[in-house]
Amino acid sequence: MVFVNLQLKIKKGLESEFIDELNVLLKETRSYEGCHAVYFIQNQDDASNIEFCSKWDSKQHYEKYLQWRIESGVLEETANKYGDGEPVWRYFDLVSEF
């Protein structure tokens, strides 16, 4: 099991539009093979700071999903339209669950 954290900075004033668009796209993410959960969160103090936390069977499952998003063109299109800086990906192993 792997948790993927994707940190994004969104162009000021486009946060609501970005959220609306991503809420549609994330339904496809959730149904992708190997995905168990996706959380889309927004910083309370800076609305342009948005993160995705997702739970996957493995890093390979996530990488396959990411490649699909890259090949579809949606990742580049969304980044060009809304992104304000480079995204940051971090991968975490589950240590304990209570």
Region locations from a protein language model:
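Short, well-ordered beta-strand segments in beta-rich or mixed alpha/beta enzyme
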Residues: 2-8, 39-66
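Short amphipathic alpha-helical/adjacent loop interface patches that line ligand
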Residues: 22, 26
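Short, flexible segments with low predicted structural confidence
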Residues: 1-2, 17, 33-35
